[in-house]
């Protein structure tokens, strides 16, 4: 039996994964590599502007989806001036998958 805190955390992960847009964001973060000639993103983090461009979503919509992903612990954010850079927390996905296997 999972502890109540673990159940709440897993519920947040499922909520985050319930959206096609958020799953697409996770896909982009998982394949993140710098684009030639671009300096906005490193090999392991992606700027919100790149997510907006790739998905064709408004920056405010990206911000909403990133808030849900952050609340679930699936991504981390780093602010640099007016830009926010996001990183996938693979260990959080692995942990959620392990919890599912134990059910």
Give residue ranges: language-model regions.
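Long, low-complexity, charged/polar intrinsically disordered regions in eukaryotic proteins
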Residues: 1-8
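N-terminal helix-turn-helix DNA-binding core of bacterial DNA-binding proteins
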Residues: 8-15, 20-58, 80, 84-92
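Short, hydrophobic-biased segments on the C-terminal half of alpha helices
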Residues: 66-67
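Short beta-strand "wing" residues that participate in macromolecule-binding interfaces
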Residues: 77
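Basic, Lys/Arg-enriched C-terminal extension of HTH/homeodomain DNA-binding domains
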Residues: 91-99
